[in-house]
Swiss-Prot record:
Optimum temperature is 37 degrees Celsius. Less active at 25 degrees Celsius. The active site is at residues 59, 88. This is Phospholipase A2 phaiodactylipin. Disulfide bonds join 35-56, 55-94, 62-87, 85-127, 132-143. Residues 134-139 form a propeptide. Glycans are attached at residues 43, 101, 153. It comes from Anuroctonus phaiodactylus (Mafia scorpion). It catalyses: a 1,2-diacyl-sn-glycero-3-phosphocholine + H2O = a 1-acyl-sn-glycero-3-phosphocholine + a fatty acid + H(+). The lineage of its organism: Eukaryota, Metazoa, Ecdysozoa, Arthropoda, Chelicerata. The keyword Lipid metabolism applies. Heterodimer composed of a small subunit and a large subunit; disulfide-linked. Its EC number is 3.1.1.4. Belongs to the phospholipase A2 family. Group III subfamily. Its cofactor is Ca(2+).
Amino acid sequence: MVKRVSKEEMDALERSCSQPFEEERFLIVSGTKWCGNNNIAANYSDLGFLEADKCCRDHDHCDHIASGETKYGLENKGLFTILNCDCDEAFDHCLKEISNNVTTDIRQKGGAENVWRFYFQWYNANCYRLYCKDEKSARDEACTNQYAVVKKNFTVQ
């Protein structure tokens, strides 16, 4: 599968990849501190000027299974962290709320739309769903034996 990217996206990727290996590599969306492959925030309340940064911060703090980690009986053998599908759904909703708000500034709308496109169309990460082995709801605190099942990717509407 081939993905088309803009010149700006390619330039940003090129700059990131050309940094020396000793340096931390950050690909952070301009105007944010949380939207990217890491964060540059000083603390939890440190946000960039784009409203999408709140969505990214919340998404970064979601339940996840890191590469090489086993959790809920699921081993993540992939190169990238996978998140709970509920988190991806909340992230999708948060970004769309910003871009669909008629009173939102055009820069804010564009920022949210760019983050959405990158994550849901270009990156298109897998996610996982939690289930309970004893027929209780996975959201029920009494469920002590949750297990995870990978969903190939979050399907947006």
